[in-house]
């Protein structure tokens, strides 16, 4: 539904989505340690807001499709995230499951992490110029502690 931009259908499917195994632990640590976070998405803000609310994600900021131009792979959305986070690129880390996530992070001089669970771009992502590669959500903890 998201790829077809059928947002009403996408909204209705959110309750059918589940967090990946290990993600609840990661989110609890982010929440308990007050780690400042931002979602940078190519989806519209309404969709991202609904996902954040449904899963009660500990997210302080969102940069959605219409919030920065040009969109990923351009660094503009990542630079907007740094501005919202009041953070320098050298102090940030970015996790993404698409090549454009890695490209945008790298272009903004942000340490990039390729996330290989659930990606539909595995063969492309493996050849992207990421700083780190991880295969499960729990590995996020080794990079944010």
Located regions from the model:
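Conserved phosphate-coupling serine/threonine residues in phosphotransfer and NTP-handling enzymes
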Residues: 41-43
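Asp-based, Mg2+/Mn2+-dependent phosphohydrolase catalytic module
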Residues: 28-31, 35, 45-145
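Metal-dependent phosphoesterase signature
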Residues: 1-27, 33-35
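Internal catalytic-core helix/loop-beta-alpha segment
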Residues: 38
């Amino acid at each position: 539904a998201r790829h077809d931009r059928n947002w009403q259908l996408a909204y209705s499917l959110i309750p059918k989505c589940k967090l990946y195994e290990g993600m609840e632990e990661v989110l609890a640590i982010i929440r308990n340690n007050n780690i400042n976070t931002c979602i940078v998405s190519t989806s519209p803000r309404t969709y991202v807001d609904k996902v954040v609310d449904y899963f009660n994600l500990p997210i302080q900021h969102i940069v959605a499709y219409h919030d920065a131009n040009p969109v990923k792979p351009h660094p503009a959305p990542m630079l907007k995230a740094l501005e919202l986070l009041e953070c320098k690129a050298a102090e940030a880390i970015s996790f993404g499951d698409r090549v454009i996530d890695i490209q945008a992070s790298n272009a903004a001089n942000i340490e990039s992490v390729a996330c290989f669970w659930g990606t539909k771009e595995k063969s492309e992502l493996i050849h992207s110029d990421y700083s780190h590669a991880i295969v499960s959500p729990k590995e996020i903890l080794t990079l944010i502690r």
